[in-house]
Curated annotation (Swiss-Prot):
Coiled coil spans: 417-442, 844-940
Name of the protein: Bromodomain testis-specific protein
Gene Ontology biological process terms in this record: chromatin remodeling; male meiosis I; male meiotic nuclear division; mRNA processing; positive regulation of gene expression; regulation of DNA-templated transcription; regulation of RNA splicing; RNA splicing
Tissue: Testis-specific. Expressed in germinal cells from the early meiotic (pachytene) spermatocytes and during spermiogenesis in the round and elongating spermatids until the condensed late spermatids. No expression seen in spermatogonia.
Protein encoded by which gene: Brdt
Length: 956
């Protein structure tokens, strides 16, 4: 069988039926919730598109789909079934949802994209399903049954008269409730600041009183949402011509009971939502080790606690609290907290204080109290508004019930009474909404008063200085406009649910673009993004903002849209700033400016190179200390210094040659002066005067280059960090010769400072400067001199330019301090002491080895010549015995030790030194390592601050 014939063999079955031909479905409050809330939310989700239509096996080339999946299901079929009243109860609809998800999991593999999408949808489905009303009640059931009774009566009695009367009655009764939503909802839209809970309560209580005699009509959508009527009974299916008073009397008690039920299901405040989050936190797995005893009620029989219920009168546990929370039995957060605290008090009351369960209860109570303290308080105005609306609604319902009960049986009189009653209701509702507006304007007035008080002081100044400060008036106008704009923004949180419903879901490309835009934002803007997410996502509200993990797939569409607005606004501001700074210039001007800058830099570099070569040719007099006895090999230079010196040697061989040929006497080099600045006060004063003409032209070169200040500051900071990082490897030269270890380190630091100053000068220049002669001598031995006549002829005429200029620069002391190294006297002293101690130990070791060697030789000699030893033993006066030989050797070693231990610094016993040698060595090694670590992390902050102030002053 060929491939095309196989494809044609795949046939899609007919879609599932959505009209119930066997039995007529009914409409319940739970089915309404599934249709209006659950299905709507799933349909709007970004992952719902594969589930919105039946699976097309032909298009997707899935020949075995309908052989594996026996009962296919999709969202469109469920939607049609809900619209056509296919279901009798909500459990059938929920079963269809579960079938749709299980089909996806059955046919596809666990890691597929479609499975991940189905899991996300199922998670949303379960979240919405948890908000569904607990009790299922039929909506509009009375009307259907009474219509059937009317039709039976019409068939049995006069066929023409009674149907016409029934139709008239039904038509008249439909007119009045249809007007109710317009009357009740129009003023509610005017005052949106009242909480939605109070509105729903007032609607329920008002419409109950008016709807006494309109029970046989179909309820409108607003009434169906607010009140859920009980299923019809046989007593209510009596003939139509029953007196109105009996109907009203019978319906008073059930209606009042139903009102309380509706209030319980509707009244879910923000605090109770937080309480449910706290309960979930307490039942989480991370609290399992100390929360498990409180999950279920105490089983006194199984645990053998026969007197438990005598001591504990009101037992409580987390399972009972969760059941109450699911059934919405808590009116406010304080009832919830009272039950939780009662559970802990029962534990403390029954168990002894040192019991294990008491400790577990205390840890769990700490978790509860910590989270409960973070619950925000309810606004006082909304509570007042609730009380006002409920009181007025109760009064209206009493009046309406009394008027309805005292009404006549005739339909004309009842209609007139209804019209009058509705007019009264309209007036009273308007009065209530006016009170709500007054209450809502109270905080705004307080804010205005605060703003006025803060603005009084600048206003007084303006009266005195009207002519001096005319620019302040437009600023005040802007502030007033901002205040007016900010006032209506406070009403936005009440419309969050509408925004969430109306927000357009984001596709994959939009989410990817949003994540890229967020990454472009600076760090100070990210805090606002975290605040937006936490304020709109209840699951992330209690999370730590520093360690928050955000998944765009779990965020609501309204949150993503709000983030998109904020990010776009920030990026617009950033894009406008550089455009304002740009100045339009022609290409020729830019080229000419670049040429001028390059010429300036080349001139500065050449001048400074010539001056440096003059000074390096002068003989540098550095006093070298006498070499100590056994010098260990010095460690290799740091990588930064070595690489820098190689670069400068390779790049400036010709420059150094020209400088060596044309030498002049009379001044010392910059590196020697800066290196010996900290050794003595006399030399520091003379060297600072010599180093000034070298360092200052460098800075003028930087200024002439017109580099931006940020780059200069970064360069200087990097140079200072390099200097401080170079201190650690320099401090490791503690085992160097003891004569003058401080001078070597200071010379290397001075050379490094001059090298970094040259790097800051020539960042944009073409040539690089060579190091001074002393610096090369310290790092790489004696400098190699290359002579060339061409470089002499080129650079000699330009050498006189910087000598004639008299340059004055601010904060010269800060630049002097750059040449001075950081003091490391403590480290160097300790290194000298360490070297002396190591030297002592080595000498002692040599002495001991010598004595042992002599003893060994004598013993071997005696073993080889036994005759000599016997003769010596027989003639004690004539020869030496072994004892005398050993005693002589010991005497010699003691004399040597005493001669070596004669100085006061070595006045310790040899035996104690040998015992404590290993311990002292380990201790000193550890101390040295710690000192090196401490010195590696130190940074001269005063040096950095001086450099920063210098740059700021010169760029002003």
């Amino acid at each position: 069988m060929s491939l095309p014939s196989r494809q044609t063999a795949i046939v899609n079955p007919p879609p599932p039926e959505y009209i119930n031909t066997k039995k007529s479905g009914r409409l319940t409050n739970q089915l309404q919730f599934l249709q209006r809330v659950v299905l709507k939310a799933l349909w709007k989700h970004g992952f719902s598109w594969p589930f919105q239509q039946p699976v097309d096996a032909v298009k997707l080339k899935l020949p075995d789909y309908y052989t594996i999946i026996k009962t296919p299901m999709d969202l469109n079929t469920i939607k049609k079934r809900l619209e056509n009243k296919y279901y009798e109860k909500a459990s059938e609809c929920i079963e269809d949802f579960n079938t749709m998800f299980s089909n996806c999991y059955l046919y596809n593999k666990t890691g597929d994209d479609i499975v991940v999408m189905a899991q996300a949808l199922e998670k949303l489905f379960m979240q919405k399903l948890s908000q569904m009303p607990q009790e299922e009640q039929v909506v509009g059931g009375k009307e259907r049954i009474k219509k059937d009774i009317q039709q039976k009566i019409a068939v049995s009695s006069a066929k023409e008269q009674i149907p016409s009367k029934a139709a008239e009655n039904v038509f008249k009764r439909q007119e009045i409730p249809s007007g109710l939503p317009d009357i009740s909802l129009s003023p509610l839209n005017m005052a949106q600041e009242a909480p939605p809970i109070c509105d729903s309560q007032s609607l329920v209580q008002i419409t109950k009183g008016v709807k006494r005699r309109a029970d046989t009509t179909t309820p409108t959508t607003s009434i169906a949402k607010a009140s859920s009527e009980s299923p019809p009974t046989l007593r209510e299916t009596k003939p139509v011509n029953m007196p109105v008073k009996e109907n009203t009397v019978k319906n008073v008690l059930p209606d009042s009971q139903q009102q309380h039920k509706v209030l319980k299901t509707v009244k879910v405040t923000e605090q109770l939502k937080h309480c449910s989050e706290i309960l979930k936190e307490m039942l989480a797995k991370k609290h399992l080790p100390y929360a498990w005893p409180f999950y279920n009620p105490v089983d006194a029989d199984a645990l053998g606690l026969h007197n438990y219920y005598d001591v504990v009168k009101n037992p409580m546990d987390l399972g009972t609290i969760k059941g109450k929370m699911d059934n919405q039995e808590y009116k406010d957060a304080y009832e919830f907290a009272a039950d939780v605290r009662l559970m802990f008090m029962n534990c403390y009351k029954y168990n002894p204080p040192d019991h294990e369960v008491v400790a577990m209860a205390r840890t769990l109570q700490d978790v509860f109290e910590l989270h409960f303290a973070k619950i925000p308080d309810e606004p006082i105005e909304s509570m007042h508004a609730c009380h006002l609306t409920t009181n007025s609604a109760q009064a209206l319902s009493r009046e309406s019930s009394s008027e309805a009960s005292s009404g006549d049986a005739s339909s004309e009189d009842s209609e007139d009474e209804r019209v009058q009653h509705l007019a009264k209701l309209q007036e009273q509702l308007n009065a209530v909404h006016q009170q709500l507006q007054v209450l809502s304007q109270v905080p705004l007035r307080k804010l205005k008063k605060k703003n006025e008080k803060s603005k009084r002081a600048p206003k007084r100044k303006k009266v005195n200085n009207r002519d001096e400060n005319p620019r302040k008036k437009p600023k005040q106008m802007k502030q007033k406009e901002k205040a007016k704009i900010n006032q209506p923004k406070k009403k936005k949180p009440l419309l969050k649910s509408e925004e969430e419903d109306n927000a357009k879901p984001m596709n994959y490309d939009e989410k990817r673009q949003l994540s890229l835009d967020i990454n472009k934002l600076p760090g100070d803007k990210l805090g606002r993004i975290v605040h937006i997410i936490q304020s709109r996502e209840p699951s992330l509200r209690n999370s730590n903002p520093d360690e928050i993990e955000i998944d765009f797939e779990t965020l609501k569409a309204s949150t993503l849209r709000e983030l998109e607005k904020y990010v776009l606004a920030c990026l617009r501001k950033r894009s406008l700033k550089p455009q304002a700074k740009k100045v339009v210039r022609s290409k020729e001007e830019l080229h000419s400016e670049k040429k001028l800058e390059l010429e300036r830099r080349l001139l500065d570099v050449n001048n400074q190179l010539n001056c440096r070569k003059r000074q390096t040719k002068r003989p540098a007099k550095v006093e070298k200390p006498p070499p100590p006895p056994p010098p260990p090999p010095p460690p290799p230079p740091p990588p930064e210094l070595a690489s820098g010196s190689r670069l400068t040697d390779s790049s400036s061989s010709s420059g150094s040659g020209s400088g060596s040929s044309s030498s002049s006497s009379g001044s010392s080099s910059s590196s020697s002066s800066s290196g010996s600045a900290s050794s003595s006060s006399d030399s520091s004063s003379s060297d600072s005067s010599d180093s000034e003409p070298e360092i200052f032209p460098k800075f003028t070169g930087v200024k002439q280059n017109d580099l931006p200040p940020k780059e200069n500051i970064k360069q200087i900071q990097s140079s200072v960090q390099d200097i401080t990082s170079a201190e650690a490897p320099l401090a490791q030269q503690s085992t160097a010769p003891c004569g003058a270890p401080g001078k070597h380190s200071q010379q290397m630091l001075g050379c490094q400072v001059t090298q970094h100053l040259q790097a800051t000068e020539n960042t944009a220049s073409v040539q690089t400067q060579p190091l001074s002669g002393d610096c090369k001598r310290v790092l790489l031995g004696p400098p190699v001199v290359h002579t060339s006549a061409e470089s002499l002829t080129v650079l000699e005429p330009e050498c006189h330019a910087p000598a004639q200029k008299d340059i004055k620069i601010k904060n010269a002391d800060s630049w002097k301090s750059l040449g001075k190294p950081v003091k490391a006297s403590s480290v160097l002293k300790s290194s000298d002491e360490l070297f002396n101690q190591f030297r002592k130990a080595a000498i002692e070791k040599e002495v001991k080895a010598r004595t042992q060697e002599q003893m060994r030789k004598h013993l071997e000699h005696n073993a080889k010549d036994p005759k000599v030893s016997q003769e010596n033993q027989r003639e004690p006066g004539s020869g030496l015995t072994l004892e005398s030989l050993s005693s002589k050797v010991q005497d010699k070693s003691l004399e040597e030790d005493q001669s070596e231990q004669q100085p006061p610094s070595e006045a310790q016993d040899v035996s104690k030194l040998w015992l404590l040698k290993d311990r002292n060595l380990a201790r000193e090694k550890e101390q040295e390592r710690r000192r090196r670590e401490a010195m590696a992390g130190t940074i001269d902050m005063t040096l950095q601050s001086d450099i920063m102030t210098m740059f700021e002053n010169n760029f002003d």
